[in-house]
UniProtKB/Swiss-Prot annotation:
InterPro entries: Oligpept_transpt, OPT. GO terms for biological process: protein transport. Its main location: membrane. Expressed in flowers and roots, and at a low level in leaves and stems. Detected in the cambial zone of the vascular bundles and in the region of lateral root initiation. Low expression in the vascular network of the petals and high in the stamen filaments and the gynoecium. The chain crosses the membrane at residues 43-63, 66-86, 116-136, 148-168, 210-230, 258-278, 288-308, 357-377, 412-432, 443-463, 489-511, 527-547, 602-622, 645-665, 678-698. The gene is OPT6. The keyword Thylakoid does not apply. One of its GO terms (cellular component) is membrane. Belongs to the oligopeptide OPT transporter (TC 2.A.67.1) family. This is Oligopeptide transporter 6. Coiled coil: none annotated. The lineage of its organism: Eukaryota, Viridiplantae, Streptophyta, Embryophyta, Tracheophyta.
Length: 736
């Protein structure tokens, strides 16, 4: 049944055993019962089942306008009664007793370690398979056929490649107490609420009771933003002041404009793109807020009203690509029969244009890349070097949780990860040669993508482990291959998923390892659950995506879908546009000497200088401790999810993050310690369960409630996407 020791490890709470991060000290228990069975029959059944269900549901909702992401927390809660039921009804008989292969279907009470591994399976299903974007782009946007086998191989190799990078860097990103991975504390707290025998204080309630109340309330409430009153998703009241004014619409729209005053009374809107605001450290939330305000309320409007890059010819906020006259760009017309750029048609059609905000976000992506490198070097470089040297030293001071894990369990050998890594790279090389006509990526592109991934994984890992924000570095992969190997959109997409998404997947695995670290799960058992969960998830995600593309008419095609359709695929749209800019047309014709946006490259320099200025300020003014909390990669990368995320997602998220991260944490510390993460889990679960119920009971049958609160334009700002330049004609917009 896995690695079982024979001792219970209590830990005295002296100064040496205190965690360096207060939130971890308040949340994570310092005890371990290493005799608990882990790899049980019910763990495999419930874990694989949860993985299948979440994979299907999340891929199903991936294509929706507000893509609901059902986290592993939902399954974490749902399996508890099932686990206890199996513990009561399964036979306790031992099979093959007396041999090394003996096992039982029921080793006793359902325990927290089984529960954690089931959740790891669920997390595999909850995390998206990013390579499905390639399927969507080719089949739905480029309107090309795609064989299933190479598509599936790309999907599975993308996910598995991250294991290799995770194995190489887990010692530096899991064992140190400073690498605390804030979002894991939600699940740790929830495990405590579901398994601890907690005594209710007089006049209060246990965490389990509190969780159930939140779950029921969230479940009941979500019928309003999810079905009866969808306007609650984005209330843009500023537009009501003058609904016929384009300026007012641009300022107030939460979905198509700057979102001033816009707010969503919908947990899905709040947590859709940035995750739970209750799990974000205050300093990270402040950095996100500053970055959002700078971009949305200073840089974007200034650039727009100064008409930089003919900004007024296009919407102020859009991820679409445009022609010089403001009309949509016909991408399919510039592709030749070999799926390459048709240069003759492109020169006749004209260059690609984009909205001001879209151009600014690309510039911020450039700045985030250089800022990440410089920030980690100046603020964390010495620590990383010390950890690297100390990895081979004995008797060094370790975090209390690391000491418990090393005492009770065997580590996962590095060679396990290396074997997976090398075999996976070999398979990718085979794909690039044998299916080159489909993937367009040469063998040397595979090696270059791996080099980028292995270089940036530790840098982004440090940021994610300490701030709960992972700056997106997809632009570097797109930029590099776009210059070296232009005019091939599929090659660009494949290079991005191998170079960038494998790194993201690695950080997911490392985060799960940290969860196992906190919950004292045998590392080898954790490894097995991660590998199995990933394989199951890839199969289900691929099958679901393939089915939906065949099942839903005009999926993702906003020109043919009804105006109130929920199948608009905002994330796939951004991915497709990126493949056009970086892959089909190439960065040289957009951001290089042949393009109109070459000045955006100055953001690279700005991003590199900014962390140096902050670092110098910390040295010049050491008494001002707030300066060290200015985190440039998080600040400039705050809007990395925009688009497809919109202003209302950020404004709503920030309000909740400040309420709980500052006021409640500061003035109601006892309440925060006991209930904060449990509240987050309850809101997630309630919204998710009601969403599933609404779809199964009403959505599949097309039953709708028609009234002004459910109109197609949910944020009531119909003119927010209108251009303001003279003579530009767009359907539904006034002409100046």
């Amino acid at each position: 049944m896995g690695e079982i020791a024979t001792e219970f490890t209590p830990v005295m709470d002296d100064d040496d055993d205190r965690c360096v991060v207060p939130e971890v000290e308040l949340t994570v228990p310092k005890t371990d019962d290493s005799t608990l069975p882990v790899l049980t029959f019910r763990m495999w059944v419930l874990g694989i089942g949860a993985c299948i269900v979440l994979s299907f549901i999340n891929q199903f909702f991936w294509y929706r306008t507000m893509p609901l992401s059902i986290t592993g927390i939902s399954a974490q809660i749902a399996v508890v009664p099932l686990g206890h039921l199996m513990a009561r009804v399964l036979p306790t008989k031992r099979f093959l007793e007396g041999t090394r292969f003996q096992f039982t279907l029921n080793p006793g009470a359902f325990n927290v370690k089984e529960h954690v591994l089931i959740t790891i399976f669920a997390n595999s299903g909850a995390g998206s398979v990013y390579a499905t974007h390639i399927l969507s782009a080719i089949k739905l946007y480029y309107k090309r056929s795609l064989p299933f086998l190479p598509a599936f191989l790309v999907m599975i190799t993308t996910q598995i490649l991250g294991f290799g990078w995770a194995g190489l860097f887990r010692k530096h990103l899991v064992e140190p107490g400073e690498m605390w991975w804030p979002s894991n504390l939600v699940q740790v707290s929830l495990f405590g609420a579901l398994h601890e025998k907690e005594k209710k204080s007089r006049g209060g309630m246990s965490r389990t009771q509190f969780f159930l109340i939140v779950l029921v309330a969230s479940f009941a409430y979500y019928i309003f933003p999810g079905y009866l009153f969808t306007m609650l998703t984005s209330i843009s009241w500023v537009c009501w002041l003058n609904p016929k004014s384009i300026l007012v619409n641009q300022l107030g729209s939460g979905e198509h404009g700057l979102g001033i005053g816009s707010i969503g009374f919908d947990w899905v809107t709040i947590s859709a793109y940035l995750g739970s605001p209750l799990a974000s450290p205050l300093f990270a939330s402040v950095n996100v807020a500053i970055g959002f305000v700078l971009v949305m309320y200073i840089v974007t409007p200034v650039c727009y009203w100064l008409n930089i890059y003919d900004a007024k010819t296009f919407p102020i906020f859009s991820s679409q690509l445009f022609m010089g006259n403001g009309s949509r760009y016909d991408v399919l017309s510039i592709i030749d029969s070999k799926f390459h750029l048709d240069r003759v048609v492109y020169s006749r059609t004209g260059s690609i244009n984009m909205s001001t905000f879209f151009a600014v976000t690309y510039g911020l992506g450039f700045a985030t890349l250089s800022a990440t490198i410089v920030h980690v070097l100046v603020f964390n470089g010495s620590d990383l070097w010390k950890q690297t040297r100390g990895a081979f030293q004995k008797n060094k001071k370790m975090d209390i949780h690391t000491r418990i894990m090393k005492k009770n369990y065997r580590e996962v050998p590095l060679w396990w990860f290396l074997v997976i890594l090398l075999l996976n790279i070999a398979l990718i090389m085979f794909i690039s040669v044998h299916y080159n006509a489909t993937v367009q990526l040469p063998w040397w592109g595979v090696l270059l993508a791996c080099a980028i991934a292995i270089s940036f994984t530790p840098l982004i890992g440090v940021i994610a482990a300490t701030t709960n924000q992972a700056p997106g570095l997809n632009i570097i992969t797109e930029y590099v291959i776009g210059y070296i190997y232009p005019e091939r959109p599929v090659a660009n997409m494949c290079f991005k998923v191998y170079g960038y998404i494998s790194m993201t997947q690695a950080l997911t695995f490392i985060s799960d390892f940290k969860l196992g670290h906190y919950m004292k799960i045998p590392p080898r058992s954790m490894f097995m659950a991660q590998v199995a969960g990933t394989l199951v998830a890839v199969v289900v995600y691929t099958g679901t995506a393939w089915w939906l593309m065949e099942e839903i008419p005009h999926l993702c095609d906003t020109s043919l879908l009804p105006s109130d359709s929920q199948w608009t695929c905002p994330m796939d749209r951004v991915f497709f546009d990126a493949s056009v800019i970086w892959g089909l047309v190439g960065p040289r014709r957009v951001f290089g000497d042949l393009g109109e946006y070459s000045n955006v490259n100055w953001f690279f320099l700005v991003g590199a200088i900014a962390p140096l200025l902050v670092w110098l300020a910390t040295k010049m003014f050491p008494a001002q401790t707030w300066i060290a909390k200015i985190h440039i990669p998080v600040l400039v990368g705050a809007t990395a999810m925009m688009p497809p995320a919109t202003a209302v997602n950020f404004t709503s998220w920030l309000i909740v993050a400040f309420i709980f991260g500052h006021f409640i944490f500061k003035y109601r510390r006892v309440w925060w310690t006991k209930y904060n993460y449990v509240l987050s889990g309850g809101l997630d679960a309630g919204s998710a369960f009601m969403t599933i119920l609404l779809f199964l009971a009403l959505g599949r049958k097309g039953i709708e409630v028609q009234w002004w609160g459910n109109s197609g334009d949910r944020d009531t700002c119909p003119l927010a996407s209108c251009p303001t330049a003279k003579g530009v004609v767009v359907k539904g917009c006034p002409v100046f």
